[in-house]
Curated annotation (Swiss-Prot):
Record gene name: sufS
Gene Ontology CC: one annotated term: cytoplasm
Keywords recorded for this protein, A-Z: Cytoplasm, Lyase, Pyridoxal phosphate, Transferase
Matching SUPFAM superfamilies: PLP-dependent transferases
Organism: Escherichia fergusonii (strain ATCC 35469 / DSM 13698 / CCUG 18766 / IAM 14443 / JCM 21226 / LMG 7866 / NBRC 102419 / NCTC 12128 / CDC 0568-73)
Protein name (record): Cysteine desulfurase
């Protein structure tokens, strides 16, 4: 199938609107991607004609809703090449998935004197849960430092592991720098030291194929809303043997086998024992539609288009005076920058006046901001629906801001 950005854009209603009297150039998909009509319609159709509470219902609507939900679990397992659909837990998003691992597996396996390794480029969602776990149990948090070019100082990694290392928690792709980490090398090293590996895939799964079996990671987590799906839904993958050993971290309906006031409670099997309460079934249906949509386009086709667009953007941005770019030349999805000494918020506000949506701030990565000694950065994201013309508008806008502000 030949990739056509014009055909893709036609599927996204919001891309036809104007902002401040100008066509919208949406360069903020790393924060949250827009939704195609196929996703919007699938979720709306479920609520119009198919909604019911899932699990245990004997009536037709409930049985059909349950089947649809479990079919999405199967589709998601194929999307990341898991061995079994029962290795996937529905979560609210990447943040909840990481917290689930920290509170279930972490509480059961990390003890005083143990250590967990993260990196200096992590999103707060892959820092704070581990800080909280370490504080609870008396463990140590170790950090892989950054290089100025936005890559990790991987030569330091072997020195961080020891017999007390329980986990390496690492981002697949940096949400600020676009750096893609060499996961196979890092995961192999971690396993040689007897440590498990959690991968934050929130910024990876929309850009190219992900194969959790080839990676051999123990945990992989991502969000639906960055993958052109709904908010409030994501996937946590856990190797089956690990998942079966993990205790539930939330209690309630749907995750129990039996409940007795005198004899206590027993749990249902994984993954359902990690899905307490009424699930976000509509969001799950929408996620399934998003997975179907990107799979039909072909992730390899998407990757080729986006990489060509990224190379074009980086070359064109060289013409902007006083522009500082952060991150390596080879990157995925995002371009972080500052313009002269102007605050990122000011630059972002000017761009918004030109109909260009970028993200400004610390991007939930304060340790990374501290490393570069800046309070904030602008970040332009490039997704499969962005165009060369939108890149040109960004470049022209930045040149104009430089002339105005000096």
């Amino acid at each position: 199938m030949t990739f056509s950005v014009d055909k893709v854009r036609a599927d996204f209603p919001v891309l036809s609107r104007e902002v401040n009297g100008l066509p919208l150039a949406y360069l903020d998909s790393a924060a949250s991607a827009q939704k195609p009509s196929q996703v919007i319609d699938a979720e709306a159709e479920f609520y119009r004609h198919g909604y019911a509470a899932v699990h245990r219902g004997i009536h037709t609507l409930s049985a059909q809703a349950t089947e649809k939900m479990e079919n999405v679990r199967k589709r998601a397992s194929l999307f990341i090449n898991a061995r079994s659909a029962e290795e996937l837990v529905f979560v609210r998003g990447t943040t909840e998935g990481i917290n689930l691992v920290a509170n279930s597996w972490g509480n059961s396996n990390v003890r005083a004197g143990d250590n967990i390794i993260i990196s200096q480029m992590e999103h707060h969602a892959n820092i704070v849960p581990w800080q909280m776990l370490c504080a609870r149990v008396g463990a140590e948090l170790r950090v892989i430092p950054l290089n100025p070019d936005g890559t990790l100082q991987l030569e330091t990694l072997p020195t961080l592991f020891d017999e007390k290392t329980r986990l390496l928690a690492i981002t697949h792709v940096s949400n600020v720098l676009g750096t893609e980490n060499p996961l196979v090398e890092m995961i192999t090293l971690a396993h040689q030291h007897g440590a498990k590996v959690l991968v934050d895939g929130a910024q990876a799964v929309m850009h190219h194929p992900v194969d959790v079996q080839a990676l051999d990671c123990d945990f992989y987590v991502f969000s639906g809303h960055k993958l052109y799906g709904p908010t409030g839904i994501g996937i946590l993958y856990v190797k089956e043997a690990l998942l079966q050993e993990m205790p539930p971290w939330e209690g309630g309906g749907s995750m129990i086998a039996t409940v007795s006031l005198s004899e206590g409670t027993t749990w249902t099997k994984a993954p359902w024992r990690f899905e307490a309460g009424t699930p976000n079934t509509g969001g799950i249906i929408g996620l399934g539609a998003a997975l179907e949509y990107v799979s039909a386009l072909g992730l390899n086709n998407i990757a080729e288009y986006e990489q060509n667009l990224m190379h074009y953007a980086l070359s064109q941005l060289e013409s902007v005076p006083d522009l500082t770019l952060y991150g390596p030349q080879n990157r995925l999805g995002v371009i972080a920058f500052n313009l002269g000494k102007h605050h990122a918020y000011d630059v972002g506000s000017f761009l918004d006046n030109y109909g260009i949506a970028v993200r400004t701030g610390h991007h939930c990565a304060m340790p990374l901001m501290a490393y570069y000694n800046v309070p904030a950065m602008c970040r332009a994201s490039l997704a499969m629906y962005n165009t060369h013309e939108e890149v040109d508008r960004l470049v022209t806008g930045l040149q104009r801001i430089h002339r105005l502000l000096g």
